[in-house]
Structure formats: C-alpha cells, structure tokens
C-alpha cells in the first residue's frame, strides 16, 4: 500500500485508508500518468482545462504522430500540491488510463538543514558587518570584506536551494 504513491506506507491507517499528510512535512509529489483516447483533440482540451482549473501550468510539451497513424503528446505539468489528487482524478476522467505511477519524496530534513544554514549565515553576516564598522585598519577591513563576500555567496547559494525546494513542494509534477 502506498501513501499518495511511492513505496512507503507512511500516511496509511491499519485499514489501508489514506491519512491527511502532516502539513509540517515537506513532501514533493510526482506522478507519471499515461492516457489514451480515440478523441485526441477533445481529450487534450479536457486535460488542459482540468490543469487550468487546478491552477497548474505546462512546464514542457512534446508531440508527434499524424491523424492517419495516431497522434501523441507528452506533457510535463506542474500542479499546486493541494490540487494534486483532484487533478489526477480529473485527468483520468479526460481519457482512458493506461498506466499511473506515483512517488513522494520527503525533503523535510533537507529543507530544515537549508533553513538552519541560512540562519547561521545571516547571523555570521550580521556579526561581520559589525566588525567591519569597527575595523581599525585597512588590512582588517579587507579581510572582513573578503569574509563577507564568501558568506554572501553562501547565502545566495542556499537561498537558491530553498527556492528550488519550495517550488518542488508547492507544485507537484
């Protein structure tokens, strides 16, 4: 049994029913859904309408084939995590499901680690700025400026990592 997909039973009761995910956890939801339909245009339109209603967007698109031999499309769709389950249901109603695989990734520890590092670096930057204001000579000032530059680089790097995690958590794929 799985909780929102994947290979885990986390989030399941003894009876096998889903529990609401812990809002404090930072979970990335991913699904790979294959659909088929003899009505390509209407199924595609229905799926894109469900995506718009869920507040999602097309991240990438690839299509091919012909009306004579069959057309296909492969989309990478981003859906707000709180709309993930209802969007999958709507998507499955737009055509016949041929396969579905789902996975989850709990990135709570990574997220907490990035936040802790950012807090530590912000405190370090503040202390270095205080020291810079008290620098007695040019040599000390240059050394402090060098350290500030390194700390700022690390802050920007961790801020970028946090933004990526936030995006992956907020929008399921």
What function would you assign to each model-found segment?
Residues 2-172:
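Soluble oligomerization/assembly scaffold segments of membrane-associated complexes
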């Amino acid at each position: 049994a799985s909780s929102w997909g994947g290979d885990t039973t986390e989030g399941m009761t003894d009876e096998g029913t889903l529990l609401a995910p812990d809002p404090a956890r930072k979970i990335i939801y991913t699904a790979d859904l294959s659909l088929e339909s003899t009505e390509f245009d209407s199924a595609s339109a229905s799926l894109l309408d469900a995506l718009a209603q869920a507040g999602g967007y097309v991240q990438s698109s690839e299509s091919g084939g012909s009306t004579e031999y069959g057309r296909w499309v492969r989309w990478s769709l981003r859906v707000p995590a709180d709309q993930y389950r209802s969007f999958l249901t709507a998507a499955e109603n737009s055509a016949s499901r041929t396969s579905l695989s789902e996975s989850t990734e709990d990135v709570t520890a990574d997220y907490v680690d990035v936040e802790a590092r950012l807090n530590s670096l912000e405190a370090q930057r503040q202390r270095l700025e205080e020291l810079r204001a008290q620098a007695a000579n040019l040599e000390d000032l240059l050394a402090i400026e060098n350290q500030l530059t390194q700390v700022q680089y690390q802050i920007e790097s961790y801020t970028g990592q946090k933004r990526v995690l936030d995006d992956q958590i907020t929008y399921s794929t």
